[in-house]
Structures are given as structure tokens and as C-alpha cells.
Amino acid sequence: KGTPVLGVCGGYQMLGQTLDDPTGSESGRPQTLRGLGLLPTRTVFSEQKRRAQVKATVAAAPFAGAELEGYEIHTGVTEAEGEPFAHYPDGGREGCVQGDVFGTYLHGLFDTGTLTEALAGWLCRRKGIDPSDAALIPMEQYRRQQFDILADGVRGALDMDAVYAAMGMEKH
């Protein structure tokens, strides 16, 4: 009803019409479950897991052209009748889009920043906010800040002199 939805991996599968597990590989017994019905997709689970590093270009408006690098790790194959979320360099399609509902198998969507910026700008405009007023920082900078916060927390919780001594190192 006008609210954007993004499903990644299992979330993408659940946004579809059905999830078919003919061998019980995911659920422990053969069964077919109804999905949320927000995307025109059908997923069939299998014993084999797909693991791949991938690059793709977003096809879905309003993010079309954003370059992605990420990975897939999932069981099953999803057949999509809707528009693709992205295209692989070989022309293959990835994911599915219907209206403001987006589904993809690609983990790491927001690691490069191009999709993050496009998505944030789109959401700002939908809410009547000028994207240039939004305080966005590059993903790598954010990640470093979060690691610094984590490191400070670990240092505060440990006797670092004892840790350095146990490692045979001098305190820096």
C-alpha cells in the first residue's frame, strides 16, 4: 500500500507467491508454503546451495544504473515473472521488482554506496526531504566508525595491560 519493501535472500523468497520444498531440504519434510504474494515469483528449494561472488547493475527504477558487488548464498531457484531487480554482466537477470517491492539474492547491496545513495535519495524525495539535506556518510567511513566504537567498548571491558602481557606485547 505504498510502503517500499526490500527483501534480500530468504526475504526475497518470502515475498513471492510460493516456496516449494519438494525434498524437505529446508523444512525437514516435503511441503509447499504460501509466500506473502508481493512479488510474482515461485521458489523451489533444492539440496544444492549456490555460493557466488557477483557483480550486477541495478535495472529497477529509481535505482537503475547503480553498480553492485556482493555475494549469493542460498538454496533453491526462484522463477520470476516480474521485472528484474538487476542484470548480471552476461545479461542474466537477478531478483524481481513489482511496484515498490524489490527482491534480490544479493547480499552486500549497500557495501559499495551507489545503491545506498540512490535508495536514500529516493526515500528522502518520497517524504518531501531534499536529499542534499540528509547527512549521509560513505559506507566505508561508517564501517570504520562502528569498528572504532566496538574497539573502544572491548578496551573498556578488558584489562588491556593483561591482554598485552599475555600476548608478549608492549602497550601502544
Please identify what each model-predicted range represents.
Residues 3-4, 10-20, 44-47, 77-78, ...:
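Hydrophobic alpha-helix feature that most strongly marks membrane-spanning transmembrane helices
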Residues 93-172:
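Acyltransferase
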Residues 57-99:
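Catalytic beta-strand/loop cores that center a nucleophilic Ser/Cys/Thr
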Residues 27-33, 77, 168-170:
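Short flexible/disordered coil segments
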Residues 1-60, 64-69:
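Cysteine-nucleophile active-site neighborhood
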Residues 14, 38, 72, 118, ...:
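Alpha-helical scaffold segments in soluble metabolic enzymes
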Residues 51-53, 83-86, 116-119:
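Surface-exposed beta-strand edges and their flanking turn/coil or helix-capping segments
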Residues 36, 73, 107:
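Hydrophobic, well-ordered secondary-structure elements that form the walls
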